[in-house]
């Protein structure tokens, strides 16, 4: 029964996004169907085969090694803290970001990461027959994050139509950054994090093409290659990366503290008017129909709906910390669906980040395309997360 409900949920999510599209007649269904089939194959391979499980295990081992290397550096600075059996969130999840950012920048410095993005993007473009730039951007998001991926293609953004600019804004809602993965792994199961990442990239293409279908003539389907800037020396690069990583840690820490405190304050105010009413309860009821359609029993659906609302209103870290404390009491399907949904940057603050990035890259008139379509960005981010969760849910019971 719950499997059929999960399958119906997949169809309902697509149908709701289709109804939200203002240009239904322009939608090209062949690329969308191709990508859905590709996603089902990827999910089956990663979750349903021994080779896929082995591959996820090896990727997980690699990130565990990265975190262990980062922990050595943290232990040098904070030996007494790292000697404890239980280490606080700041030390276990946030400080490793400094080293992981540096590591990914080293891969970029030597051309390894750009090569991977180029090859995978080419495969996606050929398989889906979608524009090259959009296909490459979906892969860039998987490694770099939304603002960084937008910065990489900033020269091309300046000459794109408003319609295509909106497409990149919609896709940016579902990004993730390779440097943050280690933090996720300290809170939720690696298997579902690594499965969610490629699904989010492909679903970002699907949802963007449903909400904002764009026709790109063949002569315009090109990727602008800017002239190579003078390369900084290696040690200047990694030193700058470490500072960038520390800045990310401070920003995330500030947001987590601020949002948790704000949630507590809002709950206190709500409790004055209605005894026991919390923002988590409100979100649980708002998102429960969608959570129920992911094949969850009523009790679990209410809890996952609460996590969905927390992620949208605050960020994925706050929601993952809550999920971490309840993992042992939840069945595998619920854990898989919840983890997959939470693995992305889709929330209100991300809209502000995307708008700010567009403002810094484009002139005032073009950058307003984001401000005029905030609701589409939110629909895109939520729909991509729901779609990824629904697909993973089909394979985990």
Swiss-Prot record:
Pfam families in UniProt: Nucleos_tra2_C (PF07662), Nucleos_tra2_N (PF01773)
GO molecular-function terms, A-Z: nucleoside transmembrane transporter activity; symporter activity
Residues crossing the lipid bilayer are 1-21, 32-52, 62-82, 97-117, 133-153, 165-185, 187-207, 242-262, 282-302, 335-355, 377-397
In the record, biological process GO terms are:
nucleoside transmembrane transport
GO CC terms, sorted: plasma membrane
Q: Where in the cell is it found?
A: Cell membrane
Q: Which residues form a coiled coil?
A: none
According to its UniProt entry, the function of this protein is described as:
Involved in the uptake of the purine ribonucleosides inosine and guanosine.
Entry's family note: Belongs to the concentrative nucleoside transporter (CNT) (TC 2.A.41) family.
The protein depicted here goes by the name Purine nucleoside transport protein NupG
> Native species of this protein?
Bacillus subtilis (strain 168)
């Amino acid at each position: 029964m719950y499997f059929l409900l999960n399958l119906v949920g997949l169809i309902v999510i697509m149908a709701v996004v289709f109804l939200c599209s203002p240009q239904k007649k322009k939608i090209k269904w062949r690329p969308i169907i191709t990508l859905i089939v590709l996603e089902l194959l990827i999910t089956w391979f990663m979750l349903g085969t021994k080779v896929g499980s082995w591959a996820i295990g090896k990727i997980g081992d690699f990130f565990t090694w990265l975190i262990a290397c980062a922990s050595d550096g943290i232990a040098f600075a904070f030996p007494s803290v790292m000697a404890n059996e239980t280490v606080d969130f700041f030390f276990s999840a946030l400080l490793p970001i400094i080293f992981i950012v540096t590591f990914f920048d080293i891969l970029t410095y030597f051309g390894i990461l750009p090569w991977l993005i180029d090859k995978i993007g080419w495969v996606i473009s050929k398989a889906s027959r979608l524009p090259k730039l959009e296909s490459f951007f979906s892969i860039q998001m998987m490694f770099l994050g939304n603002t960084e991926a937008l910065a990489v293609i900033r020269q091309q953004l300046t000459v794109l139509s408003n319609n295509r600019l909106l497409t990149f804004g919609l896709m940016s809602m579902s990004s993730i950054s390779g440097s943050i993965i280690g933090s996720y792994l300290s809170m939720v199961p690696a298997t579902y994090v690594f499965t969610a990442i490629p699904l989010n990239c492909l679903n970002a293409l699907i949802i963007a093409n449903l909400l904002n279908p764009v026709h790109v003539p063949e002569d315009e389907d090109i990727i602008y290659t800017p002239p190579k800037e003078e390369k900084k020396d290696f040690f200047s690069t990694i030193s700058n990366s470490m500072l960038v990583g520390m800045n990310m840690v401070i920003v995330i820490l500030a947001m987590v503290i601020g949002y948790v405190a704000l949630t507590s304050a809002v709950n206190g105010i709500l409790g004055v008017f209605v005894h026991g009413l919390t923002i988590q309860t409100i979100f649980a009821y708002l998102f429960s129909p969608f959570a129920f359609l992911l094949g969850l029993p009523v009790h679990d659906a209410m809890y996952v709906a609460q996590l969905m609302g927390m992620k949208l209103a605050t960020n994925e870290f706050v929601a993952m910390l809550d999920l971490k404390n309840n993992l042992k009491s939840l069945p595998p399907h619920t854990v898989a669906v919840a983890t997959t949904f939470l693995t992305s940057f889709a929330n209100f603050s991300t809209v502000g980040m995307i708008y700010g990035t567009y403002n810094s890259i484009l002139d005032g008139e073009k950058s307003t395309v984001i401000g005029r379509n905030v609701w589409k960005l939110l629909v895109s981010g939520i729909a991509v997360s729901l779609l990824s969760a629904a697909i993973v849910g089909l394979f985990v019971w």
